[in-house]
Amino acid sequence: MSPTYDVIVIGLGGMGSAAAHHLSARGARVLGLEKFGPVHNRGSSHGGSRITRQSYFEDPAYVPLLLRAYELYEELERATGRNVATLCGGVMAGPPDSRTVSGSLRSATEWDLAHEMLDAKEIRRRFPTLAPDDDEVALFEAKAGLLRPENMVAAHLQLATRQGAELRFEEPVLRWEPYRDGVRVHTGENTYTAGQLVICPGAWAPQLLADIGVPITVERQIMYWFQPKGGTGPFVPERHPVYIWEDADGVQVYGFPAIDGPEKGAKVAFFRKGQHTTPETIDRTVHAHEVRAMADHMSALIPDLPGTFLKAATCMYSNTPDEHFVIARHPAHPESVTVACGFSGHGFKFVPVVGEILADLALTGATAHPIGLFDPARLTAPAARGVQP
């Protein structure tokens, strides 16, 4: 039997690495367990870039968490010297009544966030790479930008190690169980015990957290990189924003400036347009018809973007039915287990503040952060299951 720890963290991707950092920063004896190597590309915390924004169309309830996350981006950069965030500005575009535009405006208004509303003519003037229809508008947020996911995970792992956390990679968790006054975790190599367990399973949530009763579906997501027709000059962060663009049919795409030099292009992707999958069966091959569909869609929005196709990569979303997160004490084991899952394709920008929340819950049983929206009871109550009382 290995030594007992204060807290074991299962999963060292975005959320788990942040939890390991915040827990160890508070003096806890932490063991982190990861199925793959550090900063791997098999889950949901890779791909070179993620959008961050405060005018949050999903729900205004997320905004206070984002304000704290932005503070933690800066702290992380100061503590590690790694580039984590580049706030190059962001455009949330589409028809005025689209969720992307109207929801972003709602959050910006409710929380008094700095923003500008642009009509199609002004969008084209400010950002010549973009070609909106005359009836489209955009909310521009100067504080939006991009995150470097691999850098953020590496920074949190670096700090956790510096603070004394023991991190074990290539050691998949087979199962866990309540044990005495805490938990016991079994891997293929050892059995570990701790007073508290934090589970950040990503796309492995259906296996590791089946007993919380939340139906989480895993979705295959594709990221594409194109070399623009005239080169990357007009697409550098100083000239081209991050964007989320919704069409009249509700299809959303999101994309980034060219951030990796003149030869590596710019990244774009559809948002939630993938097939259901599992971590074991996901198709990691990106097919020619998928590349064509992406290029065809973007040719109307950003005509110069789909010049030469460079590469593509897959990742996985873990979606809840309402697309809101699950962050809570485990319903069946509230005294010793904390869970974080179902980030539904929009969670990475919250990584540092989720780590802070998970440390609060594991060490004190509560958090001052507003997380009522993320209670799994909303999805497991009789009404959520379609059962009449």
Swiss-Prot record:
A GO cellular component term found in this entry reads: cytoplasm
Keyword match Cytoplasm: yes
Residue ranges spanning the membrane: these are none
Taxonomy-wise, where does this protein's organism fall, top ranks first?
Bacteria, Bacillati, Actinomycetota, Actinomycetes, Kitasatosporales
Keywords, sorted A to Z: Cytoplasm, FAD, Flavoprotein, Oxidoreductase
Which PANTHER family does the protein's record reference?
A: FAD DEPENDENT OXIDOREDUCTASE DOMAIN-CONTAINING PROTEIN (PTHR10961:SF7), PEROXISOMAL SARCOSINE OXIDASE (PTHR10961)
What is this protein identified as? Answer: Monomeric sarcosine oxidase
Q: Which reaction does it catalyse?
A: sarcosine + O2 + H2O = formaldehyde + glycine + H2O2
Gene expressing this chain = soxA
Species the sequence originates in: Streptomyces sp. (strain KB210-8SY)
